[in-house]
């Protein structure tokens, strides 16, 4: 659980365009903290959810043919 911000860590194995989208429990996209070309390496991005209500959120990382979705819990 986090309040009001969380850090998302991720690794990129091949250079390319990377997008991280954050969705609420209804599937509505509420934020896109990463949307850029990145080189190989380890990265972090912070998401401040102070403008959003408590609840379950999901982040989806997309890079090339790779896609991963993880759950986050915002407790205020």
Report each predicted region and the residues it spans:
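C-terminal outer-membrane/trafficking sorting elements
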Residues: 2-76
């Amino acid at each position: 659980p986090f309040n009001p911000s969380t850090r998302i860590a991720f690794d990129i194995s091949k250079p390319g365009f990377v997008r991280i989208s954050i969705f609420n429990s209804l599937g509505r996209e509420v934020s896109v903290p990463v949307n850029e070309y990145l080189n190989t390496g380890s990265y972090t991005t912070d998401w401040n959810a102070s403008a959003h209500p408590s609840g379950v959120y999901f982040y989806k990382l997309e890079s090339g043919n790779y896609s991963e979705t993880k759950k986050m819990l915002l407790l205020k």
